[in-house]
Swiss-Prot record:
Protein family per UniProt: Belongs to the Xni family.
Top-level lineage group: Bacteria
Keyword Hydrolase in annotation: yes
Protein name (database record): Flap endonuclease Xni
Organism: Shewanella baltica (strain OS223)
Amino acid sequence: MNKFLIIDGLNLVRRIYAAIPDETDMQSLTERVSSACTKLLRVHRPTHVAIVWDGDEISWRKQLYPNYKKGRKPMPEPLAQGLVALQDHLTAMHIGSIYAAAEADDVIATLAIKTAKAQGEAIIVSTDKGFSQLNHRQISQWDHFNQQYLDIAALEQKLGVERSQFLDLMALAGDSGNKIPGIAGIGPKSAAELLKTFRSLPTLFSSLSNLGAKQAKKLAEGKEMARLSYKLAQLQTDLPLNINLKDFRVIDSPPEKTINQD
């Protein structure tokens, strides 16, 4: 069975970079990233590995909602200047790169879903909880910095909703980290309570007459914003990748069933 290790490039690199005392020390960054990737390969023993990078284009989410991710700090200049050399070094280690046009998240999600649908296993290396919406038994998420898989049960308990409701929760309450707005006046706790009662957004919005006047008014006025927020939070899983899987095979890994990535 194919086991694809899919690394969220800047999620890994920027966290390692932040821990380096001298921000111009690209040699130290390269050594630490190389060590991290070597450890990932040793721990998970995948048949395939790729590291996915964000691109420079304006994402469709930003075009849809200009405030999306507004206020994010730009990449530090030394890192921006040294990134190509780091990517080349990883290529020399036989860790191939995939370059997204804009956000890496949709490419990672698409690759994971395609792998799972082809009866393979996908392991996403990232601390981004947004990948938790990929509800498939053949997809898991690994936090390299805490050396553990994402605990979905613990996340469900923390958020107060089931995994299948994660997107509905973000549609109602928003996501401050990504500047996804949600509905004004609806916080995470009240959103979770609403979803416990009504289970889904369609049922909730068709049942506003069962709520108090004040809350019903907030929801009615914010319905379109909830739809927008849902769309912003939802990962695309059907992008054309135009890659050849054999280019990402781990050296010395035995041949396995081919995944159609077209």
